[in-house]
Amino acid sequence: MPKRNTPELPATLRRSPPEAQRTWAHTLASAERTYGPGERARRTAFASLKHRFEKVGDHWEPKDHAGPSDPRAAHGSGESFGGVDLYGHTRQELYERARELGVRGRSTMTKVELARAIATRQR
């Protein structure tokens, strides 16, 4: 299993809690046994990570409540917000994160628009 500074961990995970690193590494290993090494296994590992962690800036933090972070993750279709927990945050919390990231026009944005802007800014 990768350790904190192992190069095979993505940079955002190297800056994240050990639990996030373990979740990603275990899921990746399982997905590679199922699908073989490659993009599909990595996407599966990140999908698993997003159920318990949320991407905040350049690292992952635990969510208050485990589960899907957006409608696409919950239903398998529709728009995704790149790891931003749409359901787990109020509009005000998303607004504060957008302010910290320097998102322009945030005062007139809806909750969905704020999540979309945060996801775009964090890429």
Model-derived features with residue positions:
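Short, mixed-charge, low-aromatic patches
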Residues: 1-5, 70-75
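Poly-acidic low-complexity segments
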Residues: 24, 40, 69, 83-86, ...
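Helix N-cap / loop-to-helix initiation motif
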Residues: 37-40, 110
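Alpha-helix boundary/capping detector
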Residues: 50, 67-71, 120
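Intrinsically disordered, low-complexity charged/polar segments
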Residues: 56, 60-74
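Basic helix-extension-helix modules of the SAP/HeH family
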Residues: 75-123
